[in-house]
Amino acid sequence: MKTFSAKGHEVQRDWFVIDATDKVLGRVASEVALRLRGKHKPEFTPHVDTGDFIVVVNAGKLRVTGTKATDKTYYRHSGYPGGIYETNFKKMQERFPGRALEKAVKGMLPKGPLGYAMIKKLKVYAEETHPHAAQQPKALEL
């Protein structure tokens, strides 16, 4: 029996919606990353994007445990000397709700062209509404 290898054009992709209200950031991110890669499917192939589309709503209501809201630090750099910026989880959620989830998921995906294609299938919204009703996403409970 030959080992099955999925082809990119044969992959069946579903749409799922996750309500992130009062969910822990890391637990949501790990489940989202798993489904974006397609590891929950029997036809998973490491070098092919077999994952599903994930819509996360209420990303502004994500939480972290302990004192990470003030202690967890995110860094970015402008590219200029001395151009390093840092912010904590609480400030990032206030200013850009959902960006912490995007960064967490991106860090769990493969680096390179395959990972870039996978992260494009993640849609994060701070509120309940999203423009993907036409795709009829299925609710996914975590």
Curated annotation (Swiss-Prot):
Pfam families: Ribosomal_L13. The keyword Ribosomal protein applies. GO terms for molecular function: mRNA binding; structural constituent of ribosome. GO terms for biological process: negative regulation of translation; translation. One of its GO terms (cellular component) is cytosolic large ribosomal subunit. InterPro entries: Ribosomal_uL13 (IPR005822), Ribosomal_uL13_bac-type (IPR005823), Ribosomal_uL13_sf (IPR036899). Keywords: Ribonucleoprotein, Ribosomal protein. Belongs to the universal ribosomal protein uL13 family. This protein is one of the early assembly proteins of the 50S ribosomal subunit, although it is not seen to bind rRNA by itself. It is important during the early stages of 50S assembly. Part of the 50S ribosomal subunit. This is Large ribosomal subunit protein uL13. The gene is rplM.
